[in-house]
Amino acid sequence: MSACPAPRSPVRWLHAFTLFLLLAVLAGCVSVPKPMAGAGEDVFSRVGRFAITVTESDGKQQAVQGGFAWRDDGGSYLLDLTNPLGSTEARVEGRPGMAVLTRANGERLAAEHPDALAEDALGSPVPVTGLRDWLRGRLMAGAAPDGLERDAQGRPTAFEQDGWNARLSRYDAQGPQLLVLQRQEPGRRILVRLVITQP
């Protein structure tokens, strides 16, 4: 892993998390993602908006929002993140054994696993791997969910997995169009809201 600046204030944490999202992982100025070269039936793409709010134990809140375009062929993925004006802030590229974050200023961070990359950049665990599944309306493999609720079609609508309380709704053929993720950490609560605007 490459070096990353140390401990993060809520504002720095929000800024760094924004670069990952989401999410998306993430406004409406983002174009429809093009299929990845050599992609087959497993091609999955989503375009949308995100909002992240961190509430400190003293009641102070920090919030950021923007857009995302997620393209995933099952083996690798590409996540472009934009600010509210539509300018690209970062790109995250992942494939087995490698995850790379490239910021608009050219700075790059790399790790063997996307969750490790996120934790290195943010100083806090982020479910990048889980997000790949949750965007498709699936539970993350290898982590048993608590409090699992399903809709009439058997799709997950509420659960807790890997420390995140997730609510998925407004399903279309690809998955949920609204994801609300919450995590309680010592001294703060993190709320992530993803809204899909284009399939």
From Swiss-Prot:
A lipid is attached at C29 (S-diacylglycerol cysteine). It is a lipid-anchor. Belongs to the LolB family. It comes from Bordetella pertussis (strain Tohama I / ATCC BAA-589 / NCTC 13251). It is found in: Cell outer membrane. The keyword Membrane applies. SUPFAM superfamilies: Prokaryotic lipoproteins and lipoprotein localization factors (SSF89392). GO terms for cellular component: cell outer membrane. Plays a critical role in the incorporation of lipoproteins in the outer membrane after they are released by the LolA protein. Keywords: Cell outer membrane, Chaperone, Lipoprotein, Membrane, Palmitate, Protein transport, Signal, Transport. Coiled coil: none annotated. InterPro entries: LolA/LolB/LppX, OM_lipoprot_LolB. This is Outer-membrane lipoprotein LolB. It comes from the Bacteria. One of its GO terms (biological process) is protein transport. Monomer. Residues 1-28 form the signal peptide. A lipid is attached at C29 (N-palmitoyl cysteine). The gene is lolB.
